[in-house]
């Protein structure tokens, strides 16, 4: 594929992904709007109560998480820039993705320490790879 076609394909996938994500509801914990301690967590917890209306999928109550809301495989795993996101733990993994640098954006794993993070950042600059969490220092 030529560079122009790759860009248009990437943009098309990104637009499709945004449309699908806009339709998907924000899954909040049941009663998170009534209790501050539940709302601030913004974490989905499955309701198990016997008479819980969300669990029973009653109309007018929040949607429950299910497989049907998942995005298609072709549009899954993309960074907001439209590039495929790859998590890297060390310099060797960085070298493996160097031949895909036009289609990939690198994310340094959160478990990587400061010293190794600096090594990865220097190598990424050397190879001309884009890093999504470049400014994040743990």
UniProtKB/Swiss-Prot annotation:
Instruction: Please give the SUPFAM superfamilies that the UniProt record associates with this protein.
Output: Ribosomal protein L32e (SSF52042)
Look up keyword Repressor and say if it applies.
no
Transmembrane portions of the chain: none
Species of provenance = Saccharolobus solfataricus (strain ATCC 35092 / DSM 1617 / JCM 11322 / P2)
Homology family: Belongs to the eukaryotic ribosomal protein eL32 family.
Q: Which GO terms describe its molecular function?
A: structural constituent of ribosome
What protein name applies here? Large ribosomal subunit protein eL32
Biological processes annotated in GO: translation
For this record, the Gene Ontology CC terms, alphabetical, are: cytosolic large ribosomal subunit
Q: What Pfam families does UniProt report for this protein, alphabetically?
A: Ribosomal_L32e
The record's annotation in InterPro entries points to: Ribosomal_eL32, Ribosomal_eL32_arc, Ribosomal_eL32_CS, Ribosomal_eL32_sf
**Keyword presence, Phosphoprotein:** no
Q: Which UniProt keywords apply?
A: Ribonucleoprotein, Ribosomal protein
The record's listing under PROSITE patterns reads: RIBOSOMAL_L32E
């Amino acid at each position: 594929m030529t560079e122009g076609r790759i860009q248009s394909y990437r943009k098309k996938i990104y637009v499709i992904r945004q449309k699908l994500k806009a339709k998907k509801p924000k899954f909040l914990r049941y009663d998170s709007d009534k209790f501050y301690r539940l709302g601030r967590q913004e974490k989905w917890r499955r309701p198990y109560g016997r008479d819980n209306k969300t669990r029973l999928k009653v109309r007018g109550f929040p949607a429950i998480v299910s497989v049907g809301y998942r995005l298609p495989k072709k549009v899954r795993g993309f960074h907001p820039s439209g590039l495929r996101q790859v998590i890297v733990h060390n310099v060797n993994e960085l070298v493996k993705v160097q031949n895909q640098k036009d289609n990939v954006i690198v994310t340094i794993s959160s478990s990587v320490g400061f010293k190794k993070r600096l090594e990865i950042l220097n190598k990424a600059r050397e190879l001309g790879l884009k890093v999504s969490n470049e400014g994040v220092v743990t």
